[in-house]
């Protein structure tokens, strides 16, 4: 079989949507053993928490474009319509946190489903390489905000090949 779809259409309130999406990601991805201060911690759940809260909090609800969580063999990907403040990749070292829906952001922080504004980007950059050695999240802000999280080492190599600089680009970058 070339394709397997386990689709989930979520049309409920934000709290239930959060729980349903977290369960969906847990169902289709493996959890790896990791200790934080001698306590077993689910890195998968830490990553999922940031991904799910991002698509719920930063969504542009005036658009009919459906938010998506896509789990592939090697990747977790999201697509979410948003009002971009800038275009292109969001890097850990050069981004300015900006809540697209500040009331929702404060609510998610108050009920414990998110941390402070901007912590999601930092946490994705922190936990993705722990979950997938050598992996880095890819966050792309355009009209459709995309997050790509590698979940296998194959995805890490695939990403490196796709984003490898040419000799000319390397020379220009070093200038």
What are the residue ranges of the model-derived segments?
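C-terminal regulatory or interaction extensions
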Residues: 1-175
């Amino acid at each position: 079989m070339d394709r397997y779809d386990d689709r989930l259409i979520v049309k409920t309130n934000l709290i239930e949507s959060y729980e349903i999406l977290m369960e969906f990601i847990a169902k289709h991805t493996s959890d790896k053993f990791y200790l934080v201060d001698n306590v077993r911690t689910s890195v998968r759940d830490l990553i999922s928490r940031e991904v799910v809260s991002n698509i719920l909090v930063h969504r542009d609800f005036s658009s009919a474009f459906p938010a998506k969580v896509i789990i592939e063999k090697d990747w977790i990907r999201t697509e979410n319509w948003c009002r971009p403040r800038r275009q292109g990749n969001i890097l850990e070292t050069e981004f300015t946190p900006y809540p697209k829906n500040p009331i929702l952001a404060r609510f998610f922080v108050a009920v414990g489903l998110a941390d402070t504004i901007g912590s999601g980007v930092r946490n994705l950059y922190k936990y993705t390489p722990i979950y997938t050695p050598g992996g880095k999240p890819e966050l792309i802000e355009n009209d459709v905000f995309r997050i790509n999280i590698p979940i296998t080492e194959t995805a890490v190599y695939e990403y490196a090949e796709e984003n490898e600089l040419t000799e000319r680009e390397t020379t220009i970058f070093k200038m």
